[in-house]
Regions:
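Beta-strand-connecting loop/turn residues
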Residues: 69, 209-210, 229, 301-305
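Short, basic/aromatic recognition patches that contact phosphate-bearing ligands
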Residues: 1-107, 192, 345-351
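Core beta-strand-centered patch of the WYL/Sm-like small regulatory domain
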Residues: 11, 146-276
Length: 351
């Protein structure tokens, strides 16, 4: 039996009811709200009180929709019928549609960089943004193998990096890698001591279900990418970060994240090249998925099409190896020879 609550909580309980039980497909009358107040909150309220509190919520900025109808009601003094406005079919407009919430939840479920327990907690919070009728895919969590990261420091790492980037400070951290025991261990130096990385952080970005830190490793003048779920024991240093525009690839410009992500489809750190390659016609969708729509197609025939793309050299090499023999690098010659050599070495393994 519900515990009786003070009247001053009426407005909050009505808001809670609208959040839990209403949407465009499930509208509530004042009678419905009164019954839920009584059964779940131990409160009684007449229709005038409910309507008054709903009006107050609307005045506070809550988007509450309703339908309005007119009925004739006798004037209590004169008995003459008068128009009376009846409000009903109340529902609270959501910040997110069910489809949007499902998209967010599925993104969490199949993102391996978020620890299992924290993923489950986040899904619960997203579910709380909808109502009792919302059916998310939480069953997928129970069925998913717990192959997500073991690193429980992920969210603290993100917060500290966000602060370091805002303040323009370097950070230090240890970096994890898997051993044959299937557990993560800190990377070590040749002498066996744990290696500490000192970097200048610039941006964090998600790619292919993984979360990366784009930064500069202190010893060099180029860009490095590190998996956030493998960063541990991160500390903000007092030393100012190296400005991105001072790096050799920056050409005096600040980081353009959209361009960087487009040119680094595999998040490898190496020089960009103008790559010309031949692909089978069936590969066109894969090319656009990986390199974007700014590629140029030419010399199309039944066998294939030639593609020109400005991209990261290591990424182009990996793409050509992954999709051989349907991809043939034409230019630059240096890259063509590297791919050829890698394929020859791979073939030797099978001889």
């Amino acid at each position: 039996m519900p515990v009786k609550q003070p009247k001053k909580l009426l407005i909050m309980n009505i808001l809670d009811i609208l959040r839990k039980y209403s949407d465009e497909e499930h509208r509530l009358s004042q009678k419905d709200i009164a019954e839920i107040l009584k059964t779940e909150y131990g409160m009684t309220a007449d229709r005038k009180a409910i309507r008054r509190n709903i009006l107050n919520l609307m005045d506070c900025g809550y988007n509450i929709e309703y339908s309005e109808s007119i009925r004739m009601v006798p004037n209590p003094k004169t008995g003459v019928p008068e128009e009376s406005y009846l409000w009903s079919d109340f529902y609270l407009e959501r910040d997110f549609t069910d489809g949007e919430l499902r998209l967010l939840i599925d993104s969490l479920l199949f993102s391996k960089h978020i620890p299992y327990s924290q993923c489950k907690e986040l899904v619960g919070k997203l579910e709380g943004l909808s109502n009792v009728y919302f059916r998310s895919r939480v069953k997928h969590i129970a069925r998913l193998p717990e192959d997500k990261t073991d690193n429980k420091q992920l969210f603290l790492t993100i917060e500290l990096l966000d602060e370091a980037i805002s303040r323009g400070r370097k950070v230090s951290f240890k970096y994890l890698e898997y051993g044959t025991d299937k557990r993560q261990h800190s990377k070590t130096r040749p002498d066996g001591t744990e290696r500490v990385y000192i970097i200048s952080p610039y941006q964090m970005a998600a790619k292919e279900g993984k979360y990366y830190l784009i930064c500069n490793y202190d010893k060099y003048d180029d860009i490095s990418n590190y998996r956030l779920d493998r960063i541990t024991e991160l500390k903000i240093l007092d030393e100012p970060a190296k400005p991105f525009e001072h790096l050799k690839w920056a050409n005096g410009r600040t980081l353009d994240l959209a361009t960087y992500m487009k040119e680094h489809p595999y998040m490898y750190a190496s020089d960009n090249v103008r790559a010309v390659f031949r692909v089978a016609k069936a590969m066109v969708s894969d090319v656009i998925d990986l390199f974007g729509t700014e590629v140029t197609f030419s010399d199309e025939d039944d066998a294939g099409v030639t593609v020109t793309a400005f991209t990261n050299e290591m990424a182009m090499e990996q793409f050509a190896l992954n999709f051989a023999p349907d991809v043939t690098v034409l230019e630059p010659q240096r890259l063509r020879e590297k791919v050829k050599s890698a394929l020859e070495k791979a073939l030797e393994k099978y001889n």
